[in-house]
Amino acid sequence: MPAQAPRLWLSPLAAPSGVGLSPHEEQWCAALPAALQPRYRATRQQLRARLAALFDVPPATIPLHSPPSQPPRLEQGWGFVSISHSGEQLLLAWSPWAVGVDLERRDRVLQADLLAERFFPAQESQALLALPGEERRLAVLRSWVRKEAAIKWMGSSIAQDLRHWCWDATRQELSHLQQGLKPPSRCLESAGWFCGLVGEGAATVQWGEHH
């Protein structure tokens, strides 16, 4: 097991990895619509390459189970992984503990008022709507990446749980209003991207090489 701190890697989706897919991954990739195959191939190749470097083992030996449209999993004892992509950028995470990540462009144009009112808990949306326009847009984005990361961390869905997650910027606390969960979370900024991370050890996360 590598160092006991979560790792993040941010890179272009098309970055060369020099790594192949497993036989199962090749089959899953071939079954996808042609338009989706390059993204699936690139994400799994990069994930294998990052993990191989982290564990110092050949990429083909990484015990990764990663069918399309399912959260990627490692065998017990190898830790946990999470994937997020936005446009042509890819965010990967590894952690000794359950982890979720999300990625959004810092300059993404969005209807911050509408998002806050429709999808955020009342107490959070009220605080957000009191902010000036650009500050509000950035605050909504920072909250959003934490919440999407939290949904991946708990293995849930946006439709089921987005409105139950609340980010208290004053307390710096992310909480699930129904289940009482309060996982550690971070919103990091790198090269014009907001990177949300949720899970144990978030405070000690380290960027991997060449992020």
Report residues per predicted region.
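Conserved nucleotide-ligand handling architecture
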Residues: 1-211
